[in-house]
């Protein structure tokens, strides 16, 4: 299993990404992973789930481009939002965790959270998807 990697998407957006071989997780589908992450949000005292978004279906519906190796993609949209010290945090809320299925693996990723507690929660949720 690869470790949670930090990288910059388009040289600007800091994201964290975990690539899980299908043999390294107990989950068989994007929907199963989505449900597990939904439960983690439900269990968190400050997080609120907002929506599930089928990014693959949306991109198909607008005749968009999808890489050939991508089989399914969904986003789990949620918010921690326990403080509003200024208007600035609103620009990076709500949060989203993306789940992409390819032939042999799942890629789970999210944008860096400015709040360290939120960041650690998302890291914990995502890394817990791996078999231990």
Regions found by a protein language model. Give the residues of each.
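Ser/Thr-rich, low-complexity intrinsically disordered terminal regions
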Residues: 35-87
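Terminal, regulation- and interaction-focused segments at domain boundaries
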Residues: 2-45, 54
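Short active-site-adjacent structural elements
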Residues: 87-88, 100
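C-terminal partner/receptor-binding element of secreted or periplasmic proteins
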Residues: 113-132
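Short beta-strand element of the conserved SAM-dependent methyltransferase core
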Residues: 16-21, 76-82, 99
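Short, flexible, solvent-exposed loop/turn segments with mixed acidic/basic and small polar residues
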Residues: 6-11, 66-67, 96-101
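Beta-strand/loop substructures that line and gate deep hydrophobic ligand-binding cavities in soluble
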Residues: 96-112
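Short, surface-exposed coil-to-beta transition loops
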Residues: 91-95
């Amino acid at each position: 299993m690869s470790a949670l990697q930090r990288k910059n998407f388009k040289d600007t957006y800091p994201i964290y990404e975990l690539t899980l071989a299908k043999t390294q997780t107990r989950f068989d589908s994007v929907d199963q992973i989505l449900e597990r992450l939904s439960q983690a949000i439900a269990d968190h005292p400050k997080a609120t789930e907002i929506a599930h978004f089928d990014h693959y279906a949306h991109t198909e519906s607008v005749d968009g481009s999808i890489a050939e190796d991508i089989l399914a993609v969904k986003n789990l949209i949620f918010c921690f939002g326990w403080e509003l010290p200024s208007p600035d945090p609103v620009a990076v809320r709500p949060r989203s965790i993306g789940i992409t299925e390819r032939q042999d693996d799942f890629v789970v990723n999210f944008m860096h959270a400015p709040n360290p507690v939120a960041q650690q929660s998302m890291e914990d949720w995502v890394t817990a998807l791996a078999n231990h």
